[in-house]
């Protein structure tokens, strides 16, 4: 991936304003603690459906997106249309990309799963036809096709999970860029604040009205097993729903 990121402003018509909700729901109640503040950001309109079909486009530049951990690429198509896509690893400025049935198997090209050979890394995968890319969108992520049966494709995710997807769903060749994201170093508390994270306060340091562990005279242990602010046990209680017809094998924990 090219390290020459665009330093200027994004395309204005492909941006929208982002409103921070600071962890509140539609009733104004806190549903996600330790969120708030942060710098003002502009969202980018990402082409998850790759709706420009059978028309080649060139990578005009690679940009930073403040809303996600992966990089994005500005594509200029031969008909003059511009759009942003999630930049896969290995996509360079000046590369030509396509979205069509029969493509060259190189990063950035997009097609149906039925046309992608077994063993190839893919990203930005649809879960349902014409819904747009819904998973494998985070930095450094990818899935691998391990088998095909009639109109069903079996994908293996990085977590080890095996999942069924219809063969008419779209996917993009390659893995998502910026795999070094997991090695980032925030270095100081101010970086967390700029990202919209607030300090994490212990439950035993709160008042009884704020947390089940709160209150008491002096320092206390909380008096009960560790729970969330809503009283749900935090250590050892399964929270994931196990029923899904599309998951062949669960991820490796």
Curated annotation (Swiss-Prot):
Recall the GO molecular function terms of this protein's record.
Answer: RNA binding; structural constituent of ribosome; transferase activity
Q: Which gene encodes it?
A: RPL2
Protein name (record): Large ribosomal subunit protein uL2m
Q: One GO CC annotation, please?
A: mitochondrial large ribosomal subunit
Q: Where in the cell is it found?
A: Mitochondrion
User: Which stretches does the entry tag as region Disordered?
Assistant: 209-234
Q: What broad class describes the main subcellular location of this protein?
A: mitochondrion
Which keywords accompany this UniProt record? Mitochondrion, Ribonucleoprotein, Ribosomal protein
Q: Name one GO biological process term.
A: mitochondrial translation
Keyword Mitochondrion included in the entry's annotation: yes
State the family named in the UniProt similarity comment for this chain.
Answer: Belongs to the universal ribosomal protein uL2 family.
Coiled-coil regions, chain positions: none
Pfam (any one): Ribosomal_L2
Write down the SMART domains for this protein, in alphabetical order: Ribosomal_L2, Ribosomal_L2_C
Check the record and name the InterPro entries matching this protein: NA-bd_OB-fold (IPR012340), Rib_uL2_dom2 (IPR014722), Ribosomal_uL2 (IPR002171), Ribosomal_uL2_bac/org-type (IPR005880), Ribosomal_uL2_C (IPR022669), Ribosomal_uL2_CS (IPR022671), Ribosomal_uL2_dom3 (IPR014726), Ribosomal_uL2_RNA-bd_dom (IPR022666)
